[in-house]
Amino acid sequence: MLSKDLLEALNDQMNHEYFAAHAYMAMAAYCDDASYEGFANFYIQQAKEERFHGKKIYDYINDRGEHAEFKSIPAPKTEFKSILETFKDGLAQEQDVTRRFYNLSEIAQKDKDYATISFLNWFLDEQVEEESTFETHIDYLNRIGDDCNTLYLYEKELAARSFDEE
């Protein structure tokens, strides 16, 4: 049985994962509108990954005999000035998610809920990868600058990205 605080935090995080999926779809829409289909694909795959994370938390809550509680998801930001801005926003979002998982881990440790600590370790490892991915893209976009040919090639590389549930 999960403590009240831990269940509430897990439900909040599950809902936040679905919000993150919406935010990435808004970034995909911006990219599609700007005719950057490769970048749009990157964000569509990110959204799939966030929905997978939400479902993983949903399953865990249910496996622990508790009730997953869905809440209203606020509308994400939909206006961006550049592709680089979408990646900076994505990094900030992932950093926020990392902080949220640290908080969840602290609650689980306080509760001595070792099963949840083990469950959350997967997400903590995942967040290292997520932040690194966004930092790499930001660095690369900064290096590309206004070089349209290199940006075109980079975008084509991202068009091939796909998400497979682990």
UniProtKB/Swiss-Prot annotation:
Which top EC class is given?
oxidoreductase
- Mention any Pfam family matching this sequence: Ferritin
Q: Which SUPFAM superfamilies match?
A: Ferritin-like
Q: Name one GO cellular component term.
A: cytosol
The reactions it catalyses are: 4 Fe(2+) + O2 + 6 H2O = 4 iron(III) oxide-hydroxide + 12 H(+)
Tell me where in this chain the Ferritin-like diiron domain is found.
2-145
**Which key words are in the record?**
Cytoplasm, Iron, Iron storage, Metal-binding, Oxidoreductase
Note the coiled coil stretches, chain numbering: none
**Listed CDD domains:** Nonheme_Ferritin
Q: What does this protein do?
A: Iron-storage protein.
Can you say what this protein is called?
Bacterial non-heme ferritin
| Gene this protein is translated from | ftnA
